[in-house]
Amino acid sequence: MKTLIVFNHPHEGSFCRAILEAVQHGLKESGQQSGLIHLDKDGFDPVMHAKDLKAFALAGKGFPEALDEVDPLVRKYKTKLEQTEHLVLIFPIWWMNMPAMMKGFIDKVIFPAIAYDMKGGLLKSRLPIKKVTVISTMNTPAEVYREHFNNALEGNLIKGTFRQIGIEEVEWVSLSMVKQAPQEERE
Protein backbone atom coordinates (compact mmCIF):
# COMPACT_ATOMS: atom_id res chain seq x y z
CA MET A 1 0.00 0.00 0.00
CA LYS A 2 1.31 3.47 -0.89
CA THR A 3 0.97 5.82 2.06
CA LEU A 4 1.30 9.58 1.76
CA ILE A 5 1.79 11.68 4.88
CA VAL A 6 0.82 15.36 4.79
CA PHE A 7 2.51 17.11 7.71
CA ASN A 8 2.00 20.62 9.07
CA HIS A 9 3.85 21.99 12.07
CA PRO A 10 6.55 24.68 11.90
CA HIS A 11 8.45 23.63 15.04
CA GLU A 12 10.94 20.80 14.55
CA GLY A 13 10.76 19.90 18.26
CA SER A 14 6.98 19.58 18.36
CA PHE A 15 4.98 16.59 19.51
CA CYS A 16 3.56 16.44 15.97
CA ARG A 17 7.11 16.04 14.65
CA ALA A 18 7.68 13.11 17.04
CA ILE A 19 4.44 11.54 15.77
CA LEU A 20 5.61 12.02 12.17
CA GLU A 21 8.89 10.26 12.93
CA ALA A 22 7.09 7.40 14.69
CA VAL A 23 4.66 6.94 11.76
CA GLN A 24 7.51 7.01 9.23
CA HIS A 25 9.48 4.49 11.31
CA GLY A 26 6.47 2.18 11.59
CA LEU A 27 5.83 2.32 7.84
CA LYS A 28 9.48 1.62 7.07
CA GLU A 29 9.62 -1.27 9.55
CA SER A 30 6.52 -2.85 8.01
CA GLY A 31 7.96 -2.51 4.50
CA GLN A 32 5.32 -0.09 3.27
CA GLN A 33 6.12 2.43 0.60
CA SER A 34 5.51 5.99 1.78
CA GLY A 35 6.00 9.61 0.83
CA LEU A 36 5.87 12.94 2.64
CA ILE A 37 4.44 16.35 1.91
CA HIS A 38 5.89 18.74 4.51
CA LEU A 39 3.80 21.86 4.00
CA ASP A 40 6.06 24.07 6.13
CA LYS A 41 9.33 23.00 4.47
CA ASP A 42 7.70 23.28 1.03
CA GLY A 43 6.69 26.86 1.79
CA PHE A 44 3.14 26.02 0.71
CA ASP A 45 0.95 29.09 0.19
CA PRO A 46 -2.44 28.31 1.77
CA VAL A 47 -4.20 31.34 0.30
CA MET A 48 -6.88 30.69 -2.32
CA HIS A 49 -5.94 33.42 -4.82
CA ALA A 50 -8.25 34.66 -7.60
CA LYS A 51 -6.47 32.48 -10.20
CA ASP A 52 -6.94 29.42 -7.95
CA LEU A 53 -10.62 30.16 -7.51
CA LYS A 54 -11.04 30.62 -11.27
CA ALA A 55 -9.28 27.28 -11.89
CA PHE A 56 -11.51 25.68 -9.23
CA ALA A 57 -14.65 26.92 -11.01
CA LEU A 58 -13.45 25.86 -14.48
CA ALA A 59 -12.16 22.45 -13.35
CA GLY A 60 -15.50 21.84 -11.63
CA LYS A 61 -17.25 22.51 -14.95
CA GLY A 62 -15.19 19.92 -16.81
CA PHE A 63 -12.16 21.93 -17.92
CA PRO A 64 -9.20 20.11 -16.29
CA GLU A 65 -6.73 22.20 -18.30
CA ALA A 66 -7.58 25.01 -15.87
CA LEU A 67 -5.26 23.23 -13.43
CA ASP A 68 -2.32 24.50 -15.50
CA GLU A 69 -2.94 27.87 -13.81
CA VAL A 70 -2.72 26.72 -10.19
CA ASP A 71 0.28 26.78 -7.87
CA PRO A 72 3.02 24.37 -9.12
CA LEU A 73 3.10 22.76 -5.65
CA VAL A 74 -0.59 21.89 -6.04
CA ARG A 75 0.19 20.08 -9.30
CA LYS A 76 3.08 18.26 -7.59
CA TYR A 77 0.80 17.23 -4.72
CA LYS A 78 -1.83 16.06 -7.24
CA THR A 79 0.70 13.64 -8.75
CA LYS A 80 1.48 12.24 -5.30
CA LEU A 81 -2.21 11.86 -4.39
CA GLU A 82 -2.83 9.94 -7.61
CA GLN A 83 -0.43 7.26 -6.32
CA THR A 84 -1.84 7.13 -2.79
CA GLU A 85 -4.01 4.48 -1.18
CA HIS A 86 -3.64 5.62 2.44
CA LEU A 87 -3.51 9.33 3.24
CA VAL A 88 -2.23 10.36 6.68
CA LEU A 89 -2.60 13.95 7.91
CA ILE A 90 -0.61 15.08 10.97
CA PHE A 91 -1.12 18.54 12.49
CA PRO A 92 -1.95 20.44 15.70
CA ILE A 93 -5.35 21.89 16.44
CA TRP A 94 -5.11 25.64 16.95
CA TRP A 95 -8.20 27.67 17.84
CA MET A 96 -10.30 24.51 17.57
CA ASN A 97 -9.37 23.75 13.96
CA MET A 98 -6.48 22.84 11.69
CA PRO A 99 -3.74 25.43 11.00
CA ALA A 100 -3.97 27.64 7.91
CA MET A 101 -1.50 25.59 5.86
CA MET A 102 -3.45 22.36 6.34
CA LYS A 103 -6.74 24.14 5.65
CA GLY A 104 -5.17 25.64 2.51
CA PHE A 105 -4.03 22.16 1.45
CA ILE A 106 -7.62 20.96 1.75
CA ASP A 107 -8.97 24.03 -0.08
CA LYS A 108 -6.44 24.00 -2.92
CA VAL A 109 -5.67 20.28 -3.36
CA ILE A 110 -8.92 18.51 -2.47
CA PHE A 111 -10.22 20.31 -5.54
CA PRO A 112 -12.40 19.47 -8.58
CA ALA A 113 -10.44 17.62 -11.30
CA ILE A 114 -7.78 16.75 -8.70
CA ALA A 115 -9.56 14.94 -5.89
CA TYR A 116 -13.15 14.65 -7.09
CA ASP A 117 -15.70 15.22 -9.84
CA MET A 118 -19.12 16.78 -9.41
CA LYS A 119 -21.94 14.89 -11.12
CA GLY A 120 -25.59 15.71 -10.56
CA GLY A 121 -24.84 17.55 -7.33
CA LEU A 122 -22.86 14.62 -5.91
CA LEU A 123 -19.12 14.45 -5.36
CA LYS A 124 -17.17 11.38 -6.49
CA SER A 125 -13.53 10.77 -5.63
CA ARG A 126 -11.04 10.62 -8.51
CA LEU A 127 -8.28 9.31 -6.26
CA PRO A 128 -7.26 5.74 -5.41
CA ILE A 129 -7.32 6.64 -1.69
CA LYS A 130 -9.02 3.89 0.29
CA LYS A 131 -8.28 5.17 3.79
CA VAL A 132 -7.55 8.49 5.49
CA THR A 133 -6.01 8.73 8.95
CA VAL A 134 -6.05 12.12 10.66
CA ILE A 135 -3.71 12.51 13.65
CA SER A 136 -4.13 15.75 15.56
CA THR A 137 -2.74 17.15 18.78
CA MET A 138 -4.29 19.77 21.04
CA ASN A 139 -4.05 21.20 24.52
CA THR A 140 -7.81 21.29 25.03
CA PRO A 141 -9.31 18.42 27.03
CA ALA A 142 -11.06 15.95 24.70
CA GLU A 143 -14.41 16.26 26.47
CA VAL A 144 -14.33 20.08 26.19
CA TYR A 145 -13.54 19.86 22.46
CA ARG A 146 -16.35 17.34 21.99
CA GLU A 147 -19.02 19.00 24.14
CA HIS A 148 -18.34 22.72 23.73
CA PHE A 149 -16.86 22.83 20.25
CA ASN A 150 -18.88 19.98 18.71
CA ASN A 151 -15.80 18.12 17.47
CA ALA A 152 -15.30 20.85 14.85
CA LEU A 153 -12.67 18.86 12.99
CA GLU A 154 -14.97 15.87 12.60
CA GLY A 155 -17.63 17.98 10.91
CA ASN A 156 -15.24 20.00 8.75
CA LEU A 157 -12.68 17.44 7.67
CA ILE A 158 -13.90 13.91 8.34
CA LYS A 159 -17.55 14.22 7.27
CA GLY A 160 -17.55 17.50 5.36
CA THR A 161 -14.56 16.69 3.16
CA PHE A 162 -13.37 13.09 2.95
CA ARG A 163 -16.66 11.25 3.45
CA GLN A 164 -18.43 13.75 1.22
CA ILE A 165 -16.15 12.84 -1.70
CA GLY A 166 -16.72 9.14 -1.09
CA ILE A 167 -13.83 8.02 1.12
CA GLU A 168 -15.62 5.98 3.77
CA GLU A 169 -12.70 4.67 5.81
CA VAL A 170 -11.60 7.73 7.77
CA GLU A 171 -10.01 7.41 11.20
CA TRP A 172 -9.31 10.34 13.51
CA VAL A 173 -6.70 9.93 16.26
CA SER A 174 -7.05 12.95 18.55
CA LEU A 175 -4.36 13.43 21.18
CA SER A 176 -5.41 15.98 23.78
CA MET A 177 -3.66 17.75 26.65
CA VAL A 178 -0.28 17.17 24.99
CA LYS A 179 1.56 19.99 26.78
CA GLN A 180 0.57 18.53 30.14
CA ALA A 181 1.66 14.98 29.26
CA PRO A 182 4.79 13.73 31.04
CA GLN A 183 7.89 13.41 28.82
CA GLU A 184 7.91 9.60 29.03
CA GLU A 185 4.30 9.50 27.82
CA ARG A 186 5.12 11.87 24.94
CA GLU A 187 7.93 9.57 23.81
Where are these regions (language model features)?
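Structural signal for conserved beta-strand scaffold positions within catalytic alpha/beta enzyme cores
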Residues: 36-38, 134, 172-174
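N-terminal beta1-alpha1-beta2 submodule of the flavodoxin-like/Rossmannoid cofactor-binding fold
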Residues: 1-114, 180-187
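Short, structured loop/turn "capping" segments at alpha-beta junctions
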Residues: 112, 116, 167-170
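Residues at the starts of beta-strands that form the adenosine-phosphate
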Residues: 2, 33-35, 130-132, 168-169
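Glycine-rich phosphate/pyrophosphate-binding loop and the adjoining helix
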Residues: 65, 144-187
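Short, glycine-/small-residue-rich phosphate/pyrophosphate-handling segment
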Residues: 116-163
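A short small-residue
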Residues: 1-4, 136-139, 173-179
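Structured loop/turn residues at beta-strand edges in well-structured enzyme cores
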Residues: 82, 100, 127-130, 168
